[in-house]
A protein has these predicted regions:
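Cytosolic covalent-transfer regions centered on His/Cys nucleophiles
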Residues: 1-181
């Protein structure tokens, strides 16, 4: 996400299709997609199968597309909400995650990190009240690039135990290790 991929208090129309198309235009205009329709249509099609509205007045349409040249995150804070089939009404905060068709699963990691942050009321309020595009970019990058330091020590401390269990191969074949699983 860059400031060129952020729209604040935007009027992107009153339909899901128009919001997605306007966000796809931002992606195209930054050189990260070769064709607006080639990006917008897969996201619109995916949205038609299952709405991407989440609690808090947020939507996260996402897709893979041949038109996308690099994984991209675009954001719009809408002047008026649009119905993305969210559980609590219209969405005013919309993130478009666009990934190349042949790309890996990086966009799913972004989606996961973003979704975790969007349940925090302080994060939602910061997005709603941010005065500048630069502030939006900072807020989003802080979340998307955040590491989870609390989980790493647990994983590292579990690794030696797993390795120790693995050295007793006869115990593993007896099924005694299944109790630890």
């Amino acid at each position: 996400i860059t400031t060129e991929l952020v729209a604040l208090d935007a009027d992107f129309g009153d339909s899901v299709d128009s919001v997605i198309t306007n966000l796809a235009t931002l992606v195209h205009d930054t050189g990260r997609a070769t064709d607006v329709a080639g990006l917008a249509q897969p996201a619109i099609d995916r949205e038609a199968k299952a709405g991407t509205g989440v609690p808090g007045g947020v939507a996260i349409p996402h897709c893979r597309s041949e038109a996308v040249t690099e994984p991209t995150l675009a954001f719009a804070r809408l002047g008026r909400g649009v119905d993305f089939s969210g559980p609590d009404g219209d969405a005013q905060l919309v993130f478009l995650i666009a990934a190349p068709a042949g790309g890996g699963k990086a966009h799913l990691k972004i989606l996961s990190k973003l979704a975790r942050a969007l349940v925090r009321k302080d994060f939602l309020e910061a997005l709603r009240s941010a005065p500048t595009k630069e502030e939006i970019v900072r807020l989003v990058l802080d979340v998307v690039n955040a590491e989870k330091p609390k989980k790493k020590p647990a994983t590292e401390s579990a690794a030696p135990a797993a390795g120790a269990a693995g050295t007793g191969s006869s115990a593993a074949s007896n099924g005694s290790s299944s109790a630890a699983t």
